């Protein structure tokens, strides 16, 4: 059992090292995309399922409340947080539309959709991205594996942060670290004196 525990830590560390080599440019581009949207008076919509949904909610909560230092609230909505909306749409046999309907209702040109999907193939996330495209929104996608269907939907203005792993658990861990990096970069860019 002890060796298995050490193996989990070792695999996580190796994934972090690979990500630290592969992802800084994409994370920087994503942070700048998010910052520019916020500076323009827009908002961030976030979505994900399961652990990816927890990461989406963490991102939205951090923007609304704070990351590591006090600062003004920033507009973000986790589309997976409202169980009444989700079950109302799902009850009408439109499970694939649970996020897309919200994007069409709440999203505007200049907003950003933060879409988190470990494999990039979740139908409801794919449909949310398709809806965001019709609303002239920019997409920041956190993925893993080969990026899945989601990667193929992204345009030049969009950013994919693809974790270099084929293990869902490691990808989810790195998505959380990436979300924290994005929050740190947003705070340090928008509020440099408060972040010191």
From Swiss-Prot:
It holds the Pfam family SIS_2. InterPro entries: DiaA, GmhA/DiaA, SIS_dom, SIS_dom_sf, SIS_GmhA/DiaA_subfam. Keywords: DNA replication. The keyword Mitochondrion does not apply. The keyword Transmembrane helix does not apply. Residues 34-196 form the SIS domain. GO terms for biological process: carbohydrate derivative metabolic process; DNA replication. It comes from the Bacteria. GO terms for molecular function: carbohydrate derivative binding. SUPFAM superfamilies: SIS domain. Disulfide bonds: none annotated. CDD domains: SIS_GmhA. Belongs to the SIS family. DiaA subfamily. NCBIfam families: PRK10886.1. PANTHER family: DNAA INITIATOR-ASSOCIATING PROTEIN DIAA, SEDOHEPTULOSE 7-PHOSPHATE ISOMERASE / DNAA INITIATOR-ASSOCIATING FACTOR FOR REPLICATION INITIATION. Homotetramer; dimer of dimers. HAMAP family: SIS_DiaA. Required for the timely initiation of chromosomal replication via direct interactions with the DnaA initiator protein. This is DnaA initiator-associating protein DiaA. The lineage of its organism: Bacteria, Pseudomonadati, Pseudomonadota, Gammaproteobacteria, Enterobacterales.
């Amino acid at each position: 059992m002890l060796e298995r525990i050490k193996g989990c830590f070792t695999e996580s560390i190796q994934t972090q090292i690979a990500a630290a080599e592969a992802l800084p440019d994409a994370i920087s581009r994503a942070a700048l995309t998010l910052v520019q949207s916020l500076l323009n008076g827009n908002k961030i919509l976030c979505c994900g399922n399961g652990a990816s949904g927890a990461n989406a909610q963490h991102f939205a909560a951090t923007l609304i409340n704070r990351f590591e230092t006090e600062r003004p609230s920033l507009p973000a909505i986790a589309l997976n947080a409202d169980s009444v909306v989700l079950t109302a749409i799902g009850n009408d046999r439109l499970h694939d539309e649970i996020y897309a309907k919200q994007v069409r209702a709440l999203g505007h040109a200049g907003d950003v959709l933060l879409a988190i999907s470990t494999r990039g193939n979740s139908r409801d996330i794919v449909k949310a991205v398709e809806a965001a495209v019709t609303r002239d929104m920019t997409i920041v996608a956190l993925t893993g594996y080969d990026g899945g269907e989601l990667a193929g939907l992204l345009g030049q203005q969009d950013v994919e942060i693809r974790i270099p792993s084929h293990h869902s658990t490691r990808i989810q861990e790195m998505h959380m670290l990436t979300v924290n990096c994005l929050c740190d970069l947003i705070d340090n860019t928008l509020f440099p004196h408060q972040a010191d």
